[in-house]
Swiss-Prot record:
Disulfide bonds: none annotated. Its EC number is 7.4.2.5. The active site is at residue 83. GO terms for molecular function: ABC-type transporter activity; ATP binding; ATP hydrolysis activity; ATPase-coupled lipid transmembrane transporter activity; peptidase activity. Probably part of a complex composed of LtxB, LtxD and TdeA, which forms a single transport channel across the two membranes. Involved in the export of the LtxA leukotoxin. It is a multi-pass membrane protein. It comes from Aggregatibacter actinomycetemcomitans. The gene is ltxB. This is Leukotoxin export ATP-binding protein LtxB.
Amino acid sequence: MDSQKNTNLALQALEVLAQYHNISINPEEIKHKFDIDGHGLNQTKWLLAAKSLGLKVRTANKTVDRLPFLHLPALAWRDDGEHFILLKIDQETDRYLIFDLIQKNPIVLDKNEFEERYQSKVILIASRASIVGNLAKFDFTWFIPAVIKYRKIFIETLIVSIFLQIFALITPLFFQVVMDKVLVHRGFSTLNVITVALAIVVLFEIILGGLRTYVFAHSTSRIDVELGARLFRHLLALPISYFEARRVGDTVARVRELDQIRNFLTGQALTSILDLLFSFIFFAVMWYYSPKLTLVVLGSLPCYVIWSVFISPILRRRLDDKFARNADNQSFLVESVTAINTIKAMAISPQMTNIWDKQLASYVAVSFKVTVLATIGQQGIQLIQKAVMVINLWLGAHLVISGDLSIGQLIAFNMLAGQIISPVIRLAQIWQDFQQVGISVTRLGDVLNSPTENNTASVSLPEIQGEISFRNIKFRYKPDSPMILNNINLDISQGEVIGIVGRSGSGKSTLTKLIQRFYIPEQGQVLIDGHDLALADPNWLRRQVGVVLQDNVLLNRSIRENIALTNPGMPMEKVIAAAKLAGAHDFISELREGYNTVVGEQGAGLSGGQRQRIAIARALVNNPRILIFDEATSALDYESENIIMHNMHKICQNRTVLIIAHRLSTVKNADRIIVMDKGEIIEQGKHQELLKDEKGLYSYLHQLQVN
């Protein structure tokens, strides 16, 4: 391979890795800065170039066996310049997914094939944003700052716990005095004093116990609110790709795992831990009474731990299975309710019921196994507790008979042992709940640890004018999927009306998604007014871009609120003006409550054409500089479509408009028509110009529609 090609591979690797980390890159600028002599990017220059983009990089020499422990993707550097990117390693099958920079495609290699390519040199890459994200990773450590934040409340709880433990220590001593002194000497006056004192202790114990529970619940509720608020904010900030890669029910199931964490935080787990911390005081008093009996109690503690450790892995696997089945049920339920019209129309309720019954039976079976295993765990703990009680009774009775221990001391000892064993038993049982919470934290982590589409490099730019440029765009939704857009180069002038046509799956809608920055291209740049959208704030961009889709979702609010969704305080005059422009004002005025009519869930109270016109009004009300119609009129009746087309000149005035349509009549008056096929632009021009090429795709589509 010649040096020029080697240079290109190193630069291509930097491009791919930068795009992976959502970092904009200009290859020509990199060559200008770091390839001054024209000999290409060697390892040193490559590292400097990567650091200039904000990437954290370091070199390492690693054997093949050590690669699974690295943070991927990473660049495998070769002396001959045939570098490649290591994407993923499947340790079970010894398969290696790499991105071949020569073929420009991901390929899978077995271990022998990989070892032939790999030369033990690897460059580890991470973006600064991802490093910050990892530091803030959601797991059990997330709760530590929250505890520190409310440390005053927790310190107060700790103080209350100390007093509770003192009271718990005093009570057995009272019983010892009664048994050994009062009963023997018939000291009624002493009995009265002890009874009053014990009643006061019990009263304070109840009050302080309730106060501790209240304070703890109050503080954990604050943590719960913070976690819930953070979860929803993060969920809305996730990129479209996150939701497209997951079922709705699966996402809902993960969010509902917050309930498990809430129940755990507000339960007895944390108070039991506090009680256990003071156990050493009880052990000291118990040792004073009887070292032999104390050793029996101490010997039981490892038994609780061993039993819990034995049960936990099995329980965790069952809980994982239970969550997966529950997620399947959630997904199927959401899908069924969403598609209820189709289910009714096709009379497939029996088939759907059959599927639901099978899934439900599977879930119930798994839940039953979890319950059985949890019961076995709890009964095992009870068995250990009863065994300790029997041994202590037998040994204690021997000690009393031999005169080494009084009856009062035996009773007091058993009460103190109960104070130690009780939190241990609770914790052993709570350990099973902890397994469920651990899974819940992991599931929630899938949401909270996923990177949002905003990044630290995002900047708000001046008001959009409307000039759009696509430069050498290549894009696909998944690394192992075919290219959706390939070598797209397109310049759209400010105020130009562009029609985009082509067969289904040709990449028309994907092109507009890049304009909305739903995705970052694998290669190339999308520019608006000369600004790279990879560096732009998505919210700044989308506030100035109006979009009307084929299937628009209306919220369960009034028509006015749906139109003025982005600005609830918008003057009514602007709402009405947008509705008139969209041809919606007349039918809205005929409704009994006019603009205050609640449309129902997803606009169920309106016809398809009415929903579409409200969606168009919603897109127009903010006076966007860029307007995208993605099959926006395909669902309209001819009368509604005629109203929209009649107003199209006003709608397009002083705006850059992109109209995606299958009906060519919708775009024939556009300033320019773009014809796409298989992810490429194959024709462009005005309607009449394109018809002159009788062998062209546009002419072919036009002929089909005419006939």
